[in-house]
Amino acid sequence: MGLSHALCVLRDDIRAIFKNDPAARNLAEVLLYPGLHAIILHRLAHALYRRNIPFIPRLISQISRFLTGIEIHPGARIGRGFFIDHGMGVVIGETAEIGDWVMLYQGVTLGGTGKQTGKRHPTVEDEVVIGVGAIVLGAITIGKGARIGGGAVVVKDVPPHCTAVGVPARIVARRDPITGQSRRVEPLPDPEGEMLRGLHDKVLELELRIADLEAATHVHHEEHRLKYNALPDQLWQTLLNDSAPIEEEYNQGAGI
């Protein structure tokens, strides 16, 4: 029964590759995919991990990491039809839970946000797609059918059938699960963005005030410079005016 179930799960993992990768032309090529190697080794390690067998699950995990560049903790729970495309750099933490028919691209991290024990990694529900280099952190939930854009940093729950992009990730679209059509959602409150915009406006205001002060200071200095430059001429003229009577008296013999 265990072997039969394992073969069914393996079949679904292979089906997921054919479903999601147009480059998968035949079974021989698919069997060379590092993502498939990683999930096969993980399922073996996880089965041993659940039986509380020490050391061996972790050893298998490290061998898988060495061979594929994909690091999956033996404790992570992963459903059927799981596909890691390309795979290099994928990290999945111990308490992560992944549903059925989930697809990850290279560089995805399902990580924690601290050193606390217990549930600390994401829960990814069925039919989720997580793009290249996305980082999903903490004990949050990515709802069924959600899409996470490449490079996004997700630290909050993503509702089902929504698309989240950006740093930090924001909901930008919602897909109808029946028709498959997406529609953009109204802008959500963005306190971080509003704070940054407020700081930007404040910096501009301060720059304008500094420019005004510099301009006023320049005018003030220019006025003083002109005043002091003119002062020697004024003093010389005053001295000449004051000495004129004395010179006249001297010429008339008053000083002899």
How should each PLM-predicted stretch be described?
Residues 1-63, 179-256:
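Terminal amphipathic alpha-helical/low-complexity segments used for targeting or macromolecular assembly
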Residues 34-35, 40-43, 76, 82, ...:
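Solvent-exposed, flexible loop/coil residues
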Residues 65-172:
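Structural signal for interior beta-strand "rungs" in well-ordered beta-sheet cores
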Residues 170, 174-181:
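A structural signal for small-residue-enriched, beta-sheet-centric alpha/beta enzyme cores
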